[in-house]
Amino acid sequence: MMKVLVVVALLVTLISYSSSEGIDDLEADELLSLMANEQTRKECIPKHHECTSNKHGRCRGNFFKYKCQCTTVVTQDGEQTERCFCGTPPHHKAAELVVGFGKKIFG
């Protein structure tokens, strides 16, 4: 009976040790993922900044990702160039206004 208890105790110890290593690996992976997300957040293009060369690197607003809004600019020489900036589209502004108003009313 004593040998069975010793073997069970060893098995429980081995299982808990191996699962704790797995959890540590999982936490390390999550930490690396969070660090990568933080890095991309720092590199994203903020609101009202130019996004002509990188139309997909926009930052997130309160609820939605900003849109890269482009216009054609005609220079004094008559050349047409496309200029883009990050901004919030009107329908996103309206949705944010409604959600903000709802939060104020319903807490």
UniProtKB/Swiss-Prot annotation:
Where do the coiled-coil regions begin and end? none
Please indicate which superkingdom the organism of origin belongs to. Answer: Eukaryota
Which keywords belong to this entry? Disulfide bond, Secreted, Signal, Toxin
Q: Enumerate the GO terms in the molecular function aspect.
A: toxin activity
The chain's disulfide connectivity reads C44-C59, C51-C68, C70-C84
Keyword Methyltransferase carried by entry:
no
The record lists the membrane-crossing segments as none
Q: Which residues form the signal peptide?
A: 1-20
- Maturation-removed propeptide residues: 21-41
Q: Where in the cell is it found?
A: Secreted
Q: Name one GO cellular component term.
A: extracellular region
Q: In which tissues is it expressed?
A: Expressed by the venom gland.
Give the family per the record.
Answer: Belongs to the neurotoxin 19 (CSTX) family. 04 (U1-Lctx) subfamily.
Q: What is this protein called?
A: U1-lycotoxin-Ls1h
Organism equals: Lycosa singoriensis (Wolf spider)
Q: What is the lineage of its organism?
A: Eukaryota, Metazoa, Ecdysozoa, Arthropoda, Chelicerata
